[in-house]
Amino acid sequence: MSPARGRAACKTCRSRKQKCDGIRPACSRCRSLGLQCTWPTVLKRGPPKGYTKALEARLAETELVLIRLLHATNDEGLLARAFDGDTQKRAHKRFGERNTELKSSVIGEHKMLALMDHWERFPLRTADDVRQWIGEVSKTSMMQGEGTNQSNEKTRGLLRVESSSGNADYQHEDEVQSPAGAGDDMAVGDPYRDDSVDQDSIGQPPQRTESVGNMQPACETHAVQDITTSSRIELPADFKDQFLW
């Protein structure tokens, strides 16, 4: 990324009356000479030419219209209605929006020029001028309100689309992860599965089985043990003492 390039020259180049390339934070000349590169403070631009006079003229016209209306109506209730809660809220809201737009130097300058053009096209010198101005302001307010509503509707529509898309993806994922044959009658047969094998016996340790031919009654078993015990040869005592330990 190339360094930022400014319009004004640095203080060092300006004091030496030399050409400055305007590269920030340090220009090429200051870097080559090993000098500290400092820059002048950028001042905010003032209002465009003629804005102050146009603003003063517009303010005078507005005050004159207000005075004429009050003298023509001579209605105390009109002042009360003009300063009720709803009217003051709308006026303060509009004033706050305009004041916020004028805070930025660049946007404020364009806005000031637009206001000067608006004041020139809609003066407040006659009753017809005031009616036209009121109609223009009302139309602009309605267009701004419709634009805000359309923007809000578009945002809500996008949120609904994203929400429905997320639900559809979640449902599709559940369908993919679920087994294909959840029911018993819809299960697909396993070619390696023997239907004669009980599935409950899977995982249980094998049971010890004996053949029928090897099984003997308990009485015969005791008899064989007695015969084996009785058939032992009794050795003499001298032989036991000599050869047995």
Curated annotation (Swiss-Prot):
DNA-binding region, residue intervals: 10-37
Cited SUPFAM superfamilies: Zn2/Cys6 DNA-binding domain (SSF57701)
Biotechnology and industry use: Fusaproliferin shows cytotoxicity against pancreatic cancer cell lines and provides a new chemical scaffold that can be further developed to obtain more potent synthetic agents against pancreatic cancer. Fusaproliferin and its analogs show also anti-inflammatory activity and can be hit compounds for the treatment of inflammation-associated diseases.
Keyword line: DNA-binding, Metal-binding, Nucleus, Transcription, Transcription regulation, Zinc
Protein's gene: FUP7
Name of the protein: Transcription factor FUP7
Keyword Transmembrane helix appears in the UniProt entry: no
Keyword set includes Manganese: no
